[in-house]
């Protein structure tokens, strides 16, 4: 029977609607949001790439900074979001407001600490993230406005996740899409019209994120949400902070390893000059676009898997996982084939430099081959996360950019030189796939047996 936090209508929708229609309808807003985010990341790469190879390399350096902000923001957002969702299910609005307030204001405070520390040590910070001496001025100019905006960016991630956990994903999408579109508009204006260079790209990102923050905050101030933000509701109990951290640890680990992996990639690439840093940065941004589609489809699976697993409709969980892998594979195949056929054109689009092309093209084609494995990797991880198998989910989440990637990026460049850097991510993806399959297949068989029992 449905629990008291779900209406009968929602129960029938989640347990009776045909799986393909249900998953695609739930995935559509997430795919749109993630595509917009990927597009404005590509826009940054495109516009900055018109300046110089060193400026293009700065995008990769600042990507690691953005990953740090996201790791902390997702930790507080996902950490509090699950608690808020369960509290509202128990009709405990006071607890929801307490955890919403605590996560929001704590994220803002942590963002302020990051901003002050980062600005005070900016050149050393950028070198730590993998900058070269020639990239450093561009990376510093790019990062400075983003660091100023870090408190708002981090708390925006908290608000975005609270809205999703309250079931108001469309409100979250409005803030995200508005910020993304504004970023695309402001980039050429600040970079070329106002001649601000990479600093203009950073300012465009910072301003668009501030607007997104205001839109998201307005949802809470206008009473569109159940949970509210009140300074007086910030908890003083260490146990509550530990609960937020424990719930948010998988997200923190995943995003944190993305940052560390990106930093190590930049450090390895800088031994071969600015063109290598720029080339690997361009590849990362292009394939993040393709990966965002697989992740978006996978996020359509999460509520379906969680609901039906809780309702003991295990065969629907199995059907949902298989369909999601198939749907994500179809989307990835189309995008991958288009990218493979236009590989040189795409790289030239972001930086028309023969040295950049020489580095990026082999890496591009290696990554194309490995992208076909992503649907299995993404769906396996998300399915386990959604049904509460947090140990397996955390292990798999840490594989791609952590357990598999970090040892490779520390060893292959010494053994193979530049080709070792170009091969690291595809090999890490292949290893993650090999690790994921033994988790996925037995569990799908187990779901059938559980249904029959």
Which functions belong to the PLM regions below?
Residues 14-46, 50-51, 67-79, 83, ...:
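N-terminal transmembrane alpha-helices
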Residues 25-44, 145, 179, 208-212, ...:
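Transmembrane helical elements of multi-pass membrane transporters/channels
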Residues 47-67, 134-138, 198-201, 240-247, ...:
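Interfacial/gating helices of multi-pass transporter permease domains
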Residues 56-116, 153-172, 279-343, 374-396:
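Small-residue-rich hydrophobic transmembrane alpha-helices
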């Amino acid at each position: 029977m449905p629990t008291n936090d779900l209406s009968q209508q929602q129960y029938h929708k989640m347990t009776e609607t045909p799986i393909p229609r249900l998953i695609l309808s739930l995935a559509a807003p997430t795919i749109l949001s993630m595509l917009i985010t990927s597009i404005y990341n590509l826009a940054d790469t495109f516009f900055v790439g018109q300046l110089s190879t060193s400026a293009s390399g700065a995008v990769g350096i600042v990507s690691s900074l953005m990953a740090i902000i996201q790791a902390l923001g997702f930790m507080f957002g996902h950490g509090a979001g699950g608690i808020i969702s369960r509290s509202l299910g128990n009709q405990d609005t006071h607890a929801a407001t307490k955890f919403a307030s605590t996560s929001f204001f704590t994220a803002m405070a942590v963002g302020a600490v990051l901003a002050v520390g980062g600005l005070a040590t900016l050149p050393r910070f950028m070198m730590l993230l993998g900058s070269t001496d020639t990239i450093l001025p561009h990376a510093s100019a790019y990062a400075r406005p983003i660091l100023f905006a870090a408190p708002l960016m981090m708390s925006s991630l908290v608000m975005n996740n609270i809205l999703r956990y309250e079931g108001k994903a469309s409100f979250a999408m409005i803030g995200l899409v508005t910020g993304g579109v504004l970023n695309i508009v402001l980039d050429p204006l600040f970079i070329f019209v106002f001649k601000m260079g990479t600093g203009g790209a950073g300012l465009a990102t910072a301003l668009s994120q501030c607007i997104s923050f205001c839109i998201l905050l307005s949802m809470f101030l206008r009473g569109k949400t159940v949970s509210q933000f009140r300074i007086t509701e910030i908890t003083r109990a260490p146990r509550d902070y530990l609960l937020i951290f424990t719930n948010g640890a998988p997200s923190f680990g995943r995003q944190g390893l993305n940052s560390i992996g990106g930093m190590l990639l930049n450090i390895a690439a800088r031994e071969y000059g600015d063109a290598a840093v720029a080339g690997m940065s361009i590849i990362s941004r292009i394939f993040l676009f393709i990966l965002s589609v697989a992740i978006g489809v996978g996020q359509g699976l999460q509520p379906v898997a969680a609901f039906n697993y809780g309702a003991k409709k295990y065969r629907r969980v199995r059907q949902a996982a298989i369909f999601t892998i198939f749907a994500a594979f179809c989307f990835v195949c189309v995008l991958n084939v288009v990218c493979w056929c236009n590989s040189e054109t795409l790289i030239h689009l972001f930086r028309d430099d023969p040295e950049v092309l020489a580095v990026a093209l082999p890496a591009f084609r290696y990554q194309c081959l490995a992208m076909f494995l992503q649907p299995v990797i993404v769906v396996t991880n998300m399915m386990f996360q959604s049904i509460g198998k947090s140990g397996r989910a955390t292990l798999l989440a840490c594989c791609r950019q952590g357990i598999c990637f970090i040892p490779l990026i520390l060893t292959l460049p010494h053994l193979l030189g530049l080709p070792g850097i170009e091969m690291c991510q595809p090999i890490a993806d292949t290893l993650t796939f090999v690790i994921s399959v033994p988790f996925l297949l037995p569990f799908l068989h187990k779901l059938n047996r559980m249904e029959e029992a």
